[in-house]
Design a protein with these regions (language model features):
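C-terminal scaffold of the Radical SAM
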Residues: 1-170
């Protein structure tokens, strides 16, 4: 019963650069609306190593995120997938990504800031107030069974991982 927002960053310039339609103010408004509607288990996802992102940009996003007082946060390094706009730009040398050392520093900073904020790291990318860890994630890492329902869903039953077809075409 968690509501999760794909914030990525609170830096409006970076959001625009990576093609996101939302801005930081939209995140604040959405989280406030969720709280007003009665949600208390709210999570946000941040991404680091974005094109043109500095360590200071990421630190500011972490501090802004922690200021929201949520119970769960995820922090992921940007992964460039084939057949995407970012992949094509990278192939042409037109995607200014932070180097590996900068990426490692951002991850270390994420861990330090989350711990300082009272959150416990319970897997490589996830941090939670104790008791608010993702049950699905823990089930996955503990090699327990789970069912996947719906287009594109994944499951693990009787030692076999399976995925459903998806997404559906219009």
């Amino acid at each position: 019963n968690r509501l999760s927002f794909g914030v990525q960053t609170f830096n409006d310039d970076l959001l625009k650069k990576i093609g996101r339609s939302h801005r930081a103010k939209d995140v604040f408004e959405s989280i406030e609306n969720a709280k007003t509607a009665g949600f208390d288990n709210i999570s946000i996802d941040l991404i680091y190593s974005l094109p043109g992102q500095s360590k200071q940009d990421f630190v500011q996003s972490i501090q802004t995120a922690l200021g929201l007082g949520l119970v769960h946060y995820s922090g992921y390094s940007l992964i460039i997938e084939p057949k995407t706009v970012f992949y094509n730009l990278m192939q042409k040398g037109k995607l200014p990504l932070p180097g590996e050392d900068a990426e490692a520093e951002m991850y270390e900073t994420l861990m330090e800031q989350m711990e300082s904020g009272g959150l416990r790291q319970y897997e490589i990318s996830n941090f939670a107030v104790p008791g608010y860890e993702s049950r699905h994630n823990l089930t996955y890492w503990d090699n327990e069974e789970y069912f996947g329902f719906g287009a594109g869903a994944h499951g693990y039953v009787n030692g076999i991982r399976q995925s459903n077809y998806g997404p559906l075409k219009k």
